[in-house]
Regions:
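Tandem repeat scaffolds
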Residues: 31-238
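Bacterial N-terminal signal peptides that target proteins for export
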Residues: 2-13
Length: 238
């Protein structure tokens, strides 16, 4: 009888572990199976706990990770150039110094992600969620951020040369010392507040500001589209 109870306890424990794993395993419905296998190969990951997923410097160039859940994963220094990350969940992930050049990041959740010094050159970030993301010193040259959400994001010293920010929401964002030379800022939106958007010392030379609302933005020392240096707090371009 005692042995029977021990076996029952053992099988109950195994069943509990299986159910726990199934419950917490992240959805990867549209992600390519081979690419996901490559993602896990030779890397230590706990499939149901992505925050323990160590994918530092992994090579996923051109991988199909559409709708994959990599929330909280460590992808610092990873090569994701040309990868399909449409509608993927990368919230809270570490992508510092990662290469995402020419990647498809349409509708992707990158909220609160660490994107310090990441390379987004010529990347499509349409409707991406970059709320509270850290993009300091990131390369966004020629990137398309159409209708992206950058609420409260840190873009200090980022390179946004020739980038498209048409309709982007940068309320409360930090763009101090950011290079916005020749960027498209049509319908760029800020909201006057005690927590103003910081564009101090940013370079806006040659930028398109048609319809941009910069009222309340901090523009002290910013180089304006005509090359002049602004000394006012903010203004509205209609």
């Amino acid at each position: 009888m005692k042995r029977l109870l021990t076996l029952k306890t053992f099988f109950a424990a195994v069943l509990a572990i299986v159910l726990f794993t199934l419950y917490f395993t992240p959805p990867v419905m549209a992600a390519n199976t081979e690419d996901l296998s490559q993602l896990l190969k030779d890397n230590w990951c706990v499939s149901f706990l992505w925050k323990q997923c160590d994918l530092i410097a992994v090579d996923l160039q051109g991988a199909n990770l559409q709708e994959a859940n990599l929330s909280g994963a460590n992808l610092s220094g990873a090569n994701l150039s040309g990868a399909n990350l449409k509608n993927a969940d990368l919230s809270d992930a570490d992508l510092s110094r990662a290469n995402l050049a020419n990647a498809d990041i349409l509708g992707t959740d990158l909220s609160r992600a660490n994107l310090t010094e990441a390379n987004f050159k010529s990347t499509r970030l349409w409707d991406a969620n970059l709320t509270l993301a850290n993009l300091s010193r990131a390369n966004l040259q020629n990137a398309n951020l159409l209708d992206s959400r950058l609420w409260g994001s840190n873009l200090a010293q980022a390179n946004l040369t020739d980038a498209t920010l048409h309709g982007a929401d940068l309320q409360y964002a930090n763009l101090a010392y950011t290079n916005l030379t020749n960027a498209d800022l049509q319908s760029f939106f800020f909201r006057g507040s005690k927590q103003v958007t910081n564009l101090s010392n940013a370079n806006l030379e040659g930028a398109t500001l048609t319809g941009a609302n910069l009222r309340g933005a901090l523009l002290t020392g910013a180089i304006m589209p005509d090359g002049s240096i602004n000394e006012e707090i903010g203004f509205n371009l209609n």
